[in-house]
Amino acid sequence: MDNVIEMPSGHSGALMWVADPGDAHVNGSVDQEADRAYRKLPGIAPPTGGHVFRILQLAPGKSAFMHRTDTIDYAIVQQGACVMKLDGDEEVAMNAGDVMVQRGTWHGWENRGDEPCRLAFILISSEAPEKHLHMED
């Protein structure tokens, strides 16, 4: 692939598809100009109201970069193993074939193994989560 980006963290990634709001149709062709413009933007979230599909390869031994996006995310571990770190001390171990759906949580991905871990992500733009996701009575 010619669109792989090496990140300062040592990880690498590739943007496979991006769509603006209302672009969920199969007729026509990809707007190459809009696609090139999006690839130059910083950040990982899709355009507001849109969606994005990307591949991420986690390098071994790198710490998690904690972040949150206003998205619903589908993550599929394609190769290797990793840990998804959440707020506090919570962690979820994931292996090849595992699928995770998350909704606007603070999280980070960490590869504690000796081999790269490859994940596929689909991020769908969403409203920001409420400040307090866990309400007490």
What is each residue range found by the language model?
Residues D73-Y74, V99-T105, D114-K131:
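A short hydrophobic beta-strand segment most commonly corresponding to one strand
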Residues M1-V52, L56, D137:
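A short, N-terminal "cap"/entry segment at the start of jelly-roll beta-barrel domains
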Residues A64-M66, M84-K85, H107-G113:
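Short beta-strand His + acidic residue motifs that chelate non-heme Fe in jelly-roll/DSBH
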Residues G88-G104:
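Short acidic-glycine-tyrosine-enriched beta hairpin
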Residues Q32-P42, H51-D70, R103-W106, S125-E127:
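Conserved short histidine dyad/triad with adjacent acidic residue
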